[in-house]
Structures are given as structure tokens and as C-alpha cells.
């Protein structure tokens, strides 16, 4: 149920009947304060200006044409021309009933699209670090939300599995295998990469061999392809452990690394030349873009092939976008890549559009994000100043959550405690990130994220268990409740019901904007409204069975909404805390 969309259409028709143009925008918003109703139409200002009349005068005319019978109990004009809409309690009750009768809580499915989501993208032969956290979990929230809404979602893990460094890595793997007489495990990927680089820098004979190996790998030599595959397999096996711990939905089947696009690059360059878009400049192949200017104010040259014949990330990104449209048949492509890559992506996409590889009707969207910072406001590092491994961060989260949970539940069995600590610890790390606007940097703070008050995972998980405890005390099952009517008489009942029915609107925003913090804010607000409702509207000690069952149904929909909302964020819920 999308009340915002319903009201938008009703108000728009009334505006047109009052003389507004057919493309008028009612600007329906959820009201910030209860005294302004549940929704507010703010579009009279802009339209009245076009019509040369006072906004309040237009609002009065709109009201004469606006039929919200059965939807709103009161509609009033406020200030210079805002229209405040108060939803009818009977309308709220009816739609709470409908939401409870639906597995999807009444959420409609929009027209199905094929949506490619590019996220996570770690590098081969390197361990995942905290810099991979945001892309991985924000992207996964987008995937979960879009899939719930009914879209066909293709996860694209754009792994860094190609490039000149692989000659060095294969040469070092070969040396390690010879010295260790047989198979070896890359237990310490970071150390492996570091040692390979050290040998490459210090041993000229090793470096020469590495350079030869690059040529052999790129020419398709089977031995070197096999060694390369081994490096990819070991890395992705380790990464899968991290993905599973993080409760993200990526699997090995979602890997679409740089190597996938490598065979396409010569054809891309040749085609761009044939189209007259790419030209030779100082030995390199360059595309000049009018939309980007250099310091002299001239069109900026974007190199797609170097003098030595090597390709660049831009070339790969051009091939990648083309592949996603032509082969994967994407209707929309979302990229969860940090904000530092923005200009690079814009240049690649400008070439893609110019060449006609992806039509303008297919959005290519950079859902960029800021950095994770330490308490000092600088990029999050270890005490020694090194990069924090993601696995180490999750280990610490688990340890801290374990202590916290044991303190609150000293008699809890060990296996139950471990399960709860995992849900709380991993949930805390994810929620702390997801609850911040992705476009900004944020401060990583253990104390804040593990707190049981405020907009945190432990608070949200506890809020969910608190609602469930009402049902345990009521000793009533869902089947018994199903036939009971919902009756809304109290203001707090109406406020809770209206917020519950805004779940679909929240999902729609997250799906459109890729902003998980909107869902976090909604769930936190919902938990707060339930708390006020629980305090002021007795459930188990209600004046009669009819009121008791009605309030139980509001509690039931609250629990289901909290659980489903947290699930779209990849946050586990627990039955008891």
C-alpha cells in the first residue's frame, strides 16, 4: 500500500480540475509533525506562481475538487497554501488488516525490471579490508530491497582479477610451490602479496620472469591460466567466508571480474576509432570529451589505450557497461563505488553514450559513498597505522558483543549466547554504517554502535524481541487473531498504524535512491512509536477483548514490519535478548 502515491494522484487530478497544467506536481510529503496531519501537499506554491494566482487561492480551489472520501477524515489549508491531510481511522484499520493478511505486508510489486548491481569488488591475492565494507553492505541492501519488490537482480562482483601484477603473483606462487614441494595454502594473502612485491622490486631476474609471465598469461597459455585460476579461487574462497559472516547474499557465481571484459577491449578500441570518436595522440589512443575540460578549457582527452598497447580501467568500464546492456539486458545499472571514482566513471559513461553502446533510457547510476573514519576524523586504521582487515574487524565485533551479551545474560547456554553475540556484533557493525547517509563520511565508534539505546542494531533487535514478548504473555496464536477486527480510536493507535502503512513508501525510496539510512530511520521511528503506543494504550489489560485483540494486531504488524525491514538491511533478528 503506497498512500503517498494514492494521494499524489488524487491531489493531482484536483489540481488539474482547478486549472493547473497536466504535468503539475502535488509534492505529497509525509508530515513532519502530527499537528500537520499525516501528509502534506506542498505543490501549490510552484503551480500558483505559473498561474499568476495566490497559492492559498489555488489550494482553496483544489479543495473544491478533491475527493478523499473514505481516505481522509479531515483536509485543511495551512499557512500560505499547504494542504494538510489527516487519514481516516477506518481507512487505516482496513489497510492494517490487509497488510496482515499478506505475506508481503501489503507491499505491491512494481513493473519488473532487470537491474544489475555492481558492488563489493575486492582484489585477487589481497584480503578484504574495511574499505570494502561500505560497498558490500550498502550494495547488498539495494539488492535485497529490489529483489523483495520483485525485480530480477543480477549481482555483479567486479573483482580485480586481471592486470600486470599477475605475472609477479604467478612467479611467486610458482616459487612457493617449488620450495614447499607441492600444494600450498595462501593462508596469509596479504603477506603473500607483500613478499611477491618485495622480490619483484629487489630481484631483477624474478622481475624479468614476472614480466614474461604476464605476456604468457595474456596470450592464453594454459599453465599460466591455471596458476591464475588458483589465485582467484583461493582469494574468493576466503572472501566467501567474510561474505557469509556479514550475512550478505554474494556467492562465487556472482563474480564478474575484470578478466571477463579483457577479450572485448581490442574490439572496443577498434570500434571507437571506426566511429571517429577515438584518435591517436602522442602515441596513445584517446577520446576527447567536450563535457570535460582540462585546465586550458579544452576538451579533456581520456586515454583508452596506452602507447605500449596496454588498456586502462576506463576501457574496461566501457566494455563492462556495454556487456551489461547487450548481454545481461539491463534496464538499470547501479554502481556502489566510492566517491573518489566519480569522475572516472562519468568519463567512461560519456564515451559509452557517445558510442551508442547503452541508450539514455537505461540509467547508469553511481551510488557513491564516503569513507569510514576513526575517532580522530582520519581514515580508519590499526593502531600501527596499517589497513584494518575486515575479518579482524568482525572478530573484534563478535568478541565485544560476546562480553556484552554474557553480562546481560549470565545464565544463557553457551551455544545460544554465541548465536546471539553473532547477531548483535555483526548487526551492530552493519547497522552503524547503513544508518548513516551513504554520501557522507562517518566516524566508526564501538561504544555507540553496541549501545542498547539510540538508532543502533542492538536497540532495534531488542525492540523486536519486546514486541514478541507481548504475544508470549498474551498466549494467543495468529490464527485466533486473524478473525478479530482492527479498531482505531486513540491518537497513538492512529499514529502507529499510519507509520506501519508507510513501509512500502520507505522501500520505494531505498530502491530508487540506494539509501539504506532511510529504512533505518523509518524502523527506529516505528520502534519509538510502538514504545509510546505500548505505554499509553494497554494491550494485555485493555478494557475488553475487542480492544485487546485490535491492539495485538497492531503489535503483530509492528513485529512483522521490523523483521522484514531489518531483513532488507541484512540484519538478523533474534527471539530473545
UniProtKB/Swiss-Prot annotation:
Would you tell me the Gene Ontology cellular component terms? cytoplasm
Which key words are in the record? Answer: Aminoacyl-tRNA synthetase, ATP-binding, Cytoplasm, Ligase, Nucleotide-binding, Protein biosynthesis
Main EC class of this protein?
ligase
For this protein, what is any one GO molecular function term?
Answer: arginine-tRNA ligase activity
| Location(s), subcellular | Cytoplasm
The main place the protein resides is cytoplasm
- Is Transmembrane helix set as a keyword in this record? no
What PROSITE patterns does the annotation carry? Answer: AA_TRNA_LIGASE_I
Pinpoint motif 'HIGH' region by residue range: 122-132
The EC designation for this entry is: 6.1.1.19
The UniProt entry's GO biological process terms, in alphabetical order, are: arginyl-tRNA aminoacylation
Indicate yes or no for the key word Coiled coil.
Answer: no
Q: Which SUPFAM superfamilies does this one have?
A: Anticodon-binding domain of a subclass of class I aminoacyl-tRNA synthetases, Arginyl-tRNA synthetase (ArgRS), N-terminal 'additional' domain, Nucleotidylyl transferase
What's its catalytic activity?
Answer: tRNA(Arg) + L-arginine + ATP = L-arginyl-tRNA(Arg) + AMP + diphosphate
What CDD domains does the record point to? Anticodon_Ia_Arg, ArgRS_core
Which InterPro entries does this UniProt record tie to the protein?
aa-tRNA-synth_I_CS, Arg-tRNA-ligase, Arg-tRNA-synth_N, Arg-tRNA-synth_N_sf, ArgRS_core, DALR_anticod-bd, Rossmann-like_a/b/a_fold, tRNAsynth_Ia_anticodon-bd
Assembly and oligomerization = Monomer.
Instruction: Give the family this protein belongs to, as stated in its UniProt record.
Output: Belongs to the class-I aminoacyl-tRNA synthetase family.
Entry's HAMAP family?
Arg_tRNA_synth
Put simply, this protein is called Arginine--tRNA ligase
